[in-house]
Regions:
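Ribokinase/PfkB-type carbohydrate-kinase core domain
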Residues: 1-196
């Protein structure tokens, strides 16, 4: 049902990258017609590799997923991730340039989907936020009870305001979920949070 393309940013040899991208493209013929194809972006060491991967795979993808750093690298500047007037143009740039119907971005403050049928991503965004927050506060010791406790935690107030403002400006084109308020966590795990998305 879902085909995730990722980890191309880990490849440092162009010949290997070209080979892996071509092998990935061949897999499309074996997917169900209604399969959802997701391209996971990355922080590429070799920036031209990112352009190549996007050029080759974006035409086949339904969702482009990235974190806040990858978003800012894409547009070539740092932005305030709690300022809708800065985030909206960034989303519009990625959406337009990639040609992918739906852009998913996860940050330390929120997770959002922008584009066609953004609302279909709400459960996935909420699940990603909850899983990342569970890992942040409990490391590898996540279990269903910890996940449920995390789901019940209050969100960051600034992120709630941001999501409300985004909805006011973009309507059905946006689905924005605030991250949990984890200011009380004294010994956080910060590695692997993005993998929740």
């Amino acid at each position: 049902e879902v085909f995730l393309m990722g980890c191309f940013s880990e490849i440092l040899d162009r010949d290997i990258l070209v080979d892996r991208v071509e092998k990935t493209r061949r897999l499309f013929a074996h997917l169900p017609e209604d399969a959802l194809i997701v391209l996971e972006d990355g922080c590429y060491v070799k920036k031209d590799f990112r352009y190549y991967v996007h050029e080759q795979l974006c035409p086949h993808a339904h969702i482009l997923s990235m974190n806040e750093d990858e978003l800012q690298e894409y547009i070539g500047r740092r932005i305030d991730i709690l300022d809708p007037d800065a985030v909206i143009p960034a989303l519009e740039t990625v959406h337009k340039n990639s040609g992918i119907p739906l852009v998913l971005v996860h940050s330390a403050a929120w997770a959002l989907a922008y584009g066609d049928n953004a609302g279909m991503m709400r459960a996935s965004l909420e699940g990603g936020v909850t899983m990342a927050a569970s890992r942040f506060r409990s490391g590898d010791d996540i279990n269903p009870q910890i996940y449920a406790q995390t789901a019940a935690m209050a969100p960051k107030e600034a992120a709630v305001t941001f999501c409300q403002q985004m909805r006011q400006q973009l309507g059905e084109r946006i689905c924005c979920v605030p991250c949990k308020d984890l200011s009380h966590v004294t010994n956080p795990t910060v590695v692997g949070l993005g993998d929740s998305f």
